[in-house]
């Protein structure tokens, strides 16, 4: 519970992508990113190391890689534009960085939705000391 409060307080001052990422997760996966994915496995949340623990954690690993490939921008703070067309999220706008980040967030939200069956409570609040091994490169 303490971790949830810390994350909530941190997000109060955050603008841009992290808040938008939460919104996309809710729209696409039907779950709160903050409640379900902010402290899950080895990669969901701040940082990450070791091997992803399951398919859900792998979504976060791939998302981290996607953010790492974003050029000339700060993925956690840049705002982006998207629309909904025929039930699909369409990233767009005049900001190439924002579009890149939107695509990363959209892909992660779809991955979360598609891997809901893999979600395991044993990886919620998973201790970093349990994250072992060398992950494959991005």
From Swiss-Prot:
Cofactor(s) the record lists: Ca(2+)
Keywords (A to Z) from UniProt: Calcium, Disulfide bond, Hemostasis impairing toxin, Hydrolase, Lipid degradation, Lipid metabolism, Metal-binding, Platelet aggregation inhibiting toxin, Secreted, Signal, Toxin
Key word Signal present: yes
Disulfide bonds: 42-131, 44-60, 59-111, 65-138, 66-104, 73-97, 91-102
Entry EC number(s): 3.1.1.4
Residues spanning the signal sequence: 1-16
GO biological process annotation, one example: phospholipid metabolic process
Domain of life of the organism encoding this protein: Eukaryota
Reaction(s) this enzyme catalyzes, per UniProt: a 1,2-diacyl-sn-glycero-3-phosphocholine + H2O = a 1-acyl-sn-glycero-3-phosphocholine + a fatty acid + H(+)
Organ and tissue specificity: Expressed by the venom gland.
GO annotation, cellular component aspect: extracellular region
UniProt xrefs under Pfam families: Phospholip_A2_1 (PF00068)
Localization (cell): Secreted
UniProt binding sites for Ca(2+): 43, 45, 47, 64
Molecular function GO terms recorded: calcium ion binding; calcium-dependent phospholipase A2 activity; phospholipid binding; toxin activity
Enzyme type, top EC level: hydrolase
Active site as annotated: 63, 105
Gene3D superfamilies from the UniProt entry: Phospholipase A2 domain
Main location, first listed in the record: secreted
Family statement drawn from the similarity comment of this UniProt entry: Belongs to the phospholipase A2 family. Group II subfamily. D49 sub-subfamily.
Miscellaneous information on this protein: Negative results: has no edema-inducing activities.
Function as written in the Swiss-Prot or TrEMBL entry: Snake venom phospholipase A2 (PLA2) that significantly inhibits ADP-induced platelet aggregation in platelet-rich plasma of human, rabbit and guinea pig. PLA2 catalyzes the calcium-dependent hydrolysis of the 2-acyl groups in 3-sn-phosphoglycerides.
Name the UniProt record assigns to this protein: Acidic phospholipase A2 Cvv-E6a
Organism ancestry: Eukaryota, Metazoa, Chordata, Craniata, Vertebrata
């Amino acid at each position: 519970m303490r971790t949830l409060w810390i994350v909530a307080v941190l997000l109060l001052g955050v603008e841009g992508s992290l808040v938008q990422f939460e919104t996309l997760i809710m729209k696409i996966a039907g779950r709160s990113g903050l409640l379900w994915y902010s402290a899950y496995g080895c990669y969901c949340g701040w940082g990450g190391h070791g091997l992803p623990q399951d398919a859900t954690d792998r979504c976060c690993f791939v998302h981290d890689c996607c953010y790492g490939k974003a050029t000339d921008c700060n993925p956690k703070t840049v705002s982006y534009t998207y629309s909904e067309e025929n039930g699909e999220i369409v990233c767009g706008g005049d900001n190439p960085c924002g579009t890149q980040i939107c695509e990363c967030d959209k892909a992660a939200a779809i991955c979360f939705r598609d891997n809901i069956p893999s979600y395991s409570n044993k990886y919620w609040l998973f201790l970093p000391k349990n994250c072992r091994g060398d992950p494959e490169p991005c």
